[in-house]
Each structure stands twice: as structure tokens, then as C-alpha cells.
Amino acid sequence: AAYRKYEKTGFVLGESRIDLMPEALRRYRDELRGTSPAGPVSGKTFRLISGRSPWQTHTITQDLYPAGDARRRVTMLINDRDAEELGLQSGDKAVVSGTKGSIRVILETSADLRRGVLRGQYGWGTSACLLRFSLEGSYNLNELTDADALEPATGDACFGDLRVTIRREK
């Protein structure tokens, strides 16, 4: 087979062409270039991300460990410098609010978390009918999710771009 250098973008397949950068994705990319990634806290909003904690596999696992076990801890992580600027510290109770609702959380500070970001634990919440007991600080991140906010490139929910505010619980 002979080497042939492609001079145009995309793959050439006979008369058709695969467009690796559709116009809709190109527009979305250009819109994103005008925004800055979550960086230092603005004092108003944080980007909320979620994930599982090391010992957690799903909501039901909160019933597997005895009271006082660290694996049963339900917290929301905040960067330690962001927390200090807001007068918050590990163990404080706080309210995290988005456009669709609010949740009550217990904070845990972390130097490893990027500034301007809150990290919630996936899969917790006190409304599951199979749970024998709920843990203090349990929350459901879905209460903050806007089902109408869709990511323009894929049409999926904007779980990775949820903006929230945080304040100490009164």
C-alpha cells in the first residue's frame, strides 16, 4: 500500500466524508472557549461534581457498616482555602443550593480538591425504601439537578456543570 498524506480534515471514503467535528460541536467548543474553568472561588458559585467514596458501592452499603465506622460518613468536600474564606470548617452543617432546590450537608475540607469545586457523594439520600436507617448529613444530589438543562453537544443532562452556592446552616 502506498502512503498518501491527507490534506483535508476528516476521512475520505469515496464520495462521502466523515465529519469528525460537526458544526454543532464546533459551535459548542467555541462557546466553551469564552468561559473559564472552575478556578478560585468567586464568593458566589461553585461547580458541583459527584462520585463514590472509596468504600461505597451504592446507597444500600450505608447499612452494611456499624455506627461510628468511617465508611458510613456522608460529607460534602470543599477546598480548605475556600472553606476558610467562607468561615467554614470540617464538621460544619451547610446548605448547598442550586436553581432547582437545596440540600443540607456536613462539610469536610480537603487540600486535594480544586478551588471553586464542591464534591458530593453519589448514591446517598434518605428516601430509599430499603434503608433501615438514614445517616446524619445524608443528601440526594438529584434534588439539585435541573432536568431541563441539557448539554448542547450531546443532549445529555449537565451533571458535570452544575453551579451551586453554599452557606452555613442557620
Regions found by a protein language model. Give the residues of each.
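Long, contiguous, secondary-structure-rich segments that constitute the structural scaffold
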Residues: 1, 59, 64-77, 81-170
